[in-house]
Protein backbone atom coordinates (compact mmCIF):
# COMPACT_ATOMS: atom_id res chain seq x y z
CA UNK A 1 0.00 0.00 0.00
CA UNK A 2 2.68 2.49 0.99
CA UNK A 3 4.67 2.22 -2.23
CA UNK A 4 1.73 3.30 -4.40
CA UNK A 5 -0.48 5.37 -2.12
CA UNK A 6 2.13 7.01 0.15
CA UNK A 7 5.33 7.24 -1.89
CA UNK A 8 8.37 8.64 -0.11
CA UNK A 9 10.52 11.52 -1.32
CA UNK A 10 13.94 12.03 0.23
CA UNK A 11 14.90 15.59 1.07
CA UNK A 12 18.44 16.78 1.81
CA UNK A 13 19.79 13.26 1.19
CA UNK A 14 18.78 11.93 4.65
CA UNK A 15 15.14 12.90 5.23
CA UNK A 16 12.59 10.55 3.58
CA UNK A 17 9.00 11.80 3.89
CA UNK A 18 5.83 10.03 2.80
CA UNK A 19 3.08 11.75 0.84
CA UNK A 20 0.02 11.65 3.10
CA UNK A 21 -2.54 12.53 0.43
CA UNK A 22 -3.37 8.81 -0.05
CA UNK A 23 -4.29 9.33 -3.70
CA UNK A 24 -4.57 6.76 -6.43
CA UNK A 25 -1.45 7.08 -8.59
CA UNK A 26 -2.09 8.15 -12.18
CA UNK A 27 1.11 7.59 -14.17
CA UNK A 28 -0.32 9.03 -17.40
CA UNK A 29 -1.30 12.26 -15.69
CA UNK A 30 2.03 12.40 -13.86
CA UNK A 31 3.89 12.12 -17.16
CA UNK A 32 1.71 14.76 -18.84
CA UNK A 33 2.12 17.25 -15.99
CA UNK A 34 5.70 16.44 -15.06
CA UNK A 35 4.53 15.45 -11.58
CA UNK A 36 6.07 12.78 -9.34
CA UNK A 37 5.07 9.27 -10.37
CA UNK A 38 4.50 6.74 -7.58
CA UNK A 39 4.71 3.83 -10.03
CA UNK A 40 8.32 4.72 -10.81
CA UNK A 41 9.34 3.71 -7.29
CA UNK A 42 8.96 0.02 -8.10
CA UNK A 43 9.19 0.18 -11.89
CA UNK A 44 12.21 2.46 -12.32
CA UNK A 45 13.36 0.37 -15.29
CA UNK A 46 10.21 1.25 -17.29
CA UNK A 47 9.23 4.49 -19.00
CA UNK A 48 6.18 6.64 -18.26
CA UNK A 49 4.28 5.38 -21.32
CA UNK A 50 4.64 1.77 -20.15
CA UNK A 51 3.44 2.72 -16.65
CA UNK A 52 0.41 4.58 -18.03
CA UNK A 53 -0.52 1.63 -20.29
CA UNK A 54 -0.07 -0.89 -17.47
CA UNK A 55 -2.19 1.22 -15.12
CA UNK A 56 -4.97 1.52 -17.72
CA UNK A 57 -4.86 -2.24 -18.31
CA UNK A 58 -4.91 -3.13 -14.59
CA UNK A 59 -7.45 -0.50 -13.52
CA UNK A 60 -9.76 0.19 -16.49
CA UNK A 61 -11.76 3.39 -16.13
CA UNK A 62 -9.92 4.54 -13.00
CA UNK A 63 -10.10 8.31 -12.80
CA UNK A 64 -11.98 8.79 -16.08
CA UNK A 65 -15.12 10.21 -14.45
CA UNK A 66 -13.40 12.99 -12.53
CA UNK A 67 -12.03 16.24 -13.83
CA UNK A 68 -8.27 16.30 -13.73
CA UNK A 69 -7.39 18.44 -10.72
CA UNK A 70 -3.78 18.61 -11.77
CA UNK A 71 -4.67 19.84 -15.24
CA UNK A 72 -7.03 22.51 -13.87
CA UNK A 73 -4.41 23.78 -11.42
CA UNK A 74 -1.72 23.67 -14.10
CA UNK A 75 -3.87 25.85 -16.38
CA UNK A 76 -4.58 28.26 -13.52
CA UNK A 77 -0.99 28.63 -12.45
CA UNK A 78 0.02 29.24 -16.06
CA UNK A 79 -2.61 32.01 -16.20
CA UNK A 80 -4.42 30.47 -19.16
CA UNK A 81 -8.03 31.59 -19.72
CA UNK A 82 -9.37 28.03 -20.09
CA UNK A 83 -8.50 27.55 -16.41
CA UNK A 84 -11.74 29.26 -15.39
CA UNK A 85 -13.96 26.49 -16.79
CA UNK A 86 -11.62 23.73 -15.57
CA UNK A 87 -11.54 25.17 -12.04
CA UNK A 88 -15.32 25.52 -11.95
CA UNK A 89 -15.65 21.86 -12.93
CA UNK A 90 -13.38 20.84 -10.04
CA UNK A 91 -15.15 23.14 -7.56
CA UNK A 92 -18.65 22.06 -8.59
CA UNK A 93 -18.10 18.31 -8.47
CA UNK A 94 -19.56 17.09 -5.15
CA UNK A 95 -17.35 14.00 -4.94
CA UNK A 96 -14.17 16.07 -5.14
CA UNK A 97 -12.54 16.36 -1.69
CA UNK A 98 -13.37 19.63 0.04
CA UNK A 99 -9.74 20.74 0.29
CA UNK A 100 -9.36 20.38 -3.49
CA UNK A 101 -12.66 22.24 -4.07
CA UNK A 102 -11.53 25.04 -1.75
CA UNK A 103 -8.22 25.29 -3.61
CA UNK A 104 -10.09 25.44 -6.92
CA UNK A 105 -12.22 28.32 -5.61
CA UNK A 106 -9.11 30.19 -4.43
CA UNK A 107 -7.48 29.71 -7.84
CA UNK A 108 -10.72 30.77 -9.54
CA UNK A 109 -10.20 34.16 -7.90
CA UNK A 110 -7.61 34.89 -10.57
CA UNK A 111 -10.17 34.41 -13.34
CA UNK A 112 -13.36 36.03 -12.03
CA UNK A 113 -15.90 36.86 -14.70
CA UNK A 114 -19.68 36.70 -15.11
CA UNK A 115 -19.16 33.06 -16.12
CA UNK A 116 -17.64 32.11 -12.76
CA UNK A 117 -19.93 34.27 -10.57
CA UNK A 118 -22.46 31.42 -10.03
CA UNK A 119 -19.66 29.10 -8.89
CA UNK A 120 -18.50 31.70 -6.37
CA UNK A 121 -22.07 32.21 -5.09
CA UNK A 122 -22.48 28.44 -4.73
CA UNK A 123 -19.18 28.22 -2.85
CA UNK A 124 -20.38 30.83 -0.34
CA UNK A 125 -23.26 28.46 0.51
CA UNK A 126 -21.26 25.22 0.33
CA UNK A 127 -21.66 22.73 3.20
CA UNK A 128 -17.87 22.72 3.67
CA UNK A 129 -16.45 25.51 5.84
CA UNK A 130 -13.16 25.26 3.91
CA UNK A 131 -14.96 26.08 0.68
CA UNK A 132 -16.95 28.92 2.29
CA UNK A 133 -13.76 30.46 3.70
CA UNK A 134 -12.04 30.17 0.30
CA UNK A 135 -15.00 31.90 -1.34
CA UNK A 136 -14.85 34.70 1.23
CA UNK A 137 -11.18 35.23 0.44
CA UNK A 138 -12.00 35.54 -3.25
CA UNK A 139 -14.62 38.18 -2.40
CA UNK A 140 -11.79 40.48 -1.26
CA UNK A 141 -11.19 41.29 -4.94
CA UNK A 142 -14.64 42.83 -5.31
CA UNK A 143 -15.69 46.38 -4.41
CA UNK A 144 -16.90 46.57 -0.80
CA UNK A 145 -20.58 47.00 -1.74
CA UNK A 146 -20.53 43.82 -3.84
CA UNK A 147 -18.52 42.05 -1.16
CA UNK A 148 -21.10 43.00 1.45
CA UNK A 149 -24.06 41.77 -0.63
CA UNK A 150 -22.45 38.38 -1.19
CA UNK A 151 -20.70 37.85 2.14
CA UNK A 152 -23.03 39.37 4.75
CA UNK A 153 -25.03 36.14 5.35
CA UNK A 154 -21.82 34.42 6.47
CA UNK A 155 -21.55 36.76 9.46
CA UNK A 156 -24.19 34.44 10.97
CA UNK A 157 -22.47 31.19 9.93
CA UNK A 158 -22.63 28.44 12.57
CA UNK A 159 -18.84 28.07 12.51
CA UNK A 160 -16.69 30.68 14.26
CA UNK A 161 -13.86 30.40 11.71
CA UNK A 162 -16.24 31.31 8.87
CA UNK A 163 -17.77 34.20 10.85
CA UNK A 164 -14.31 35.53 11.69
CA UNK A 165 -13.21 35.40 8.04
CA UNK A 166 -16.45 37.07 6.98
CA UNK A 167 -15.84 39.84 9.50
CA UNK A 168 -12.28 40.33 8.27
CA UNK A 169 -13.26 40.40 4.59
CA UNK A 170 -16.24 42.69 5.14
CA UNK A 171 -14.52 45.12 7.52
Give the location of each predicted region.
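Amphipathic alpha-helical scaffolding segments comprising HEAT/armadillo-like alpha-solenoid repeats
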Residues: 81-91, 113-125, 143-155, 171
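Primarily the internal scaffold of c-type cytochrome electron-transfer domains
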Residues: 1-102, 106, 111, 158-161
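Leucine-rich solenoid repeat scaffolds
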Residues: 163, 167-170
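Core register positions within helices of long alpha-helical scaffolds
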Residues: 107, 138-141, 169
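Extended hydrophobic/aromatic segments used for targeting, binding, or gating
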Residues: 123, 127-142
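Secondary-structure transition/capping motifs at alpha-helix termini
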Residues: 11-13, 142-145
Amino acid sequence: CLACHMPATTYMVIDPRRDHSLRVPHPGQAAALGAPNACGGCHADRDAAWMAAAFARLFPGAGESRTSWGRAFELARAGLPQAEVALMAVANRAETPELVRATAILELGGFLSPLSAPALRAALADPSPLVRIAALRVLEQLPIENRWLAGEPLLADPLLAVRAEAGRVLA
